[in-house]
Amino acid sequence: MFCTERQVCVRQFTQFCNVTKETIEIGAVFMYNVTIRVSEPTWKEGSFPKGELTTMYTVNAIRNICLLGHSGSGKSALAESLLYMTGAIDRMGKNADGNTVCDSDPEEIRRHISISTAVVPLEYKNTKINVLDTPGAFDFSGAVMEALRAADAAILVLSAKDGITVGFEKAWKYCEERNMPRFVYISKVDEDNSDYNATFNALREKYGNKIAPVVVPIWDESKRVIGIIDVLNKRAYEMQKLKRVEIEIPEGKEAVITEFNDALKEAVAETDEELMDRFFEGDDFTYAEMIKGLYTGVRELSLFPVLCGSAVSCLGSLMLMDSVLDLLPNPVQGNYHKATKADGTTEEFVVSPGGVPSAYVWKTVSDQYGKYSYIKVLSGEITPDTTLINARTGESEKLGRMYVMCGKKATEVKALGCGDIGALGKMDKVRTGDTLCDPRKVVSLKQIPYAPPCYSMAIAPKVKGQEDKVGTGLNRLNEEDPSFTLVNNAETHQMVISGQGDQQLDVLVSKLKSRFGVDAELMPAKIAYREKIKKTVEAHGRHKKQTGGSGQFGDVWIRFSPQEEQDELIFDVEVVGGAVPKNFNPAVEKGIQEAILKGPLAGYPMVGLKAVLYDGSYHPVDSNEMAFKMAAILAYKEAMPNAMPTLLEPVGSLAVTIPDSYMGDVIGDLNKRRGRIMGMNPDNAGNTVVDAEVPMAEMATYAIDLRAMTQARGSFTLTFERYEEVPKQYQDKIIADAKND
């Protein structure tokens, strides 16, 4: 990495070089023309001095990055490698052994996957890098949305064994939607069956010349990766006992390096018209021009550097961190936010170290022992004595104890500076998405855009009488995972939990037991069917009871008929001659209202019914409201079996977004679900949106089934549309199931 008479980034070399010429300002990065004296650096790779996590860094010396990618692509292993290479840990853990820093939750250890975002701070070359390791499993996309709110840039991880996966495509889309600067890191380059070239070429084919190779592997004669090449400097490195060592470029590899260097130059040329002209003229670019082009391209989203390595051997980890420092934005240069003021107007909220204190709560951890509110300081500096206003509630909040988190380990600190990420303890009234502001400037940043829940199940305790414990536990879990919803359905008498998939709900059930000591089980959510009659009938109801003294007497004739005006009962009176006194009419209506809560077929509510009281009789002594109410119920029960009752089912409006290649499978599946295709239209991303109407009873597992059919590339929305009659061949089973319940 050391050379003579080369222009280099000052952050990497000021500790062992002499500045000889003028400073050139490039955006927010300062570059120098320097003369390098080959000498021993003041730090040694693999043995960096461990900085105190309690150190408060200036905003320019902070990077907040999130690791995104498909499940199993190597994100947590990469974070472990970075921790080791910066001296934060003495030994790297393994996911299979359940001893990594990032996956410390008991459920993560048991399942060998990440289910929430872990924060691991690194201290490297006087800079703090907050790494946010996100889950790759789609069921836990809510945690990814939270991390994207806190990060200023992203590293998209994909495996050289698997190539571009749907998880990588989704991560790229998330970054595109947020205009987030990003790197691509190709992992596992030294493992069997890996194919770096195929993976890189696939990136180039999909995303064009914006893909810029910065670090590439070196292979030996047996196609085994033995090291990496810094394309910009044309230098080669290998790992020896987890130490990086510079090596000679292997014989015959010069052409490969030149090829990748030309590809990098082409990508840099895309960032500037003058550079593009010079590129076509065959001119070489100086090192400073290459760095400037890379930096500009990353910031303007016109260039995406590609690095590679192996987390197991730590190959490429140092070069990745160097690139993070040199090319990715600090919090001031990163994401801008839309803020809503107290009067409802919006403004650009700019991260500012000199502004009044403010912070955004982007994540919550809540268990039986307490609560941590993870924050990103957006402006100013905060201390335990700082009092801020919660923009959502309007209440004052004294911050109290503050921490820097590293996995599950909390280290108390005395202050957090602008742009940094930390946590607040025991903020009971604060929740994810809250903006904490100085009273002089109260603004609210927008909420985190969680995906709408698409998979629902009923949940109940295994031991009756513990329903309140289940509800209390789920409400606590909802504090740390707002991506799921919980509804008590009064009609079906079920507690219904909705999320992104079966894995998410299964984790919640496991956490109920481990954290709150309550055993619960999932079961299909009942469908809220309705009943309706198709024929007009007349019925007589008489309630007569004599028990000594005054008795009860009520006698009614009622005409029941179907109506389409509304779901609610329409009640009318056509009695003439005072056969039923008017003061008993409300009792008759009340009796019918009670009766229609249960239909004659399966006990589902009756809808679309009209009832006309047209005759009856009364007793001057024994008639009362209760007697006429009971008479109306008897008339209803007599009439319904003769009125051609039928079942109605809820029908939903479905919009499925899929690549065209899955069209046949999706359409065929919808037909099996009794769906009606209403139309097909292209969207702006080159996919097709299939509009359909489908019975809700057929959609219980659709989220899982669509994921399987489309390799998780499909998405859908489903909203209730109306009730329709259930085909006769399906009614008998529904009725039988209802009676069994």
Which sequence ranges carry the predicted segments?
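Generic short N-terminal amphipathic or hydrophobic helices
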Residues: 13, 23-25, 35
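Charged/polar low-complexity intrinsically disordered segments
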Residues: 7, 22-25, 44
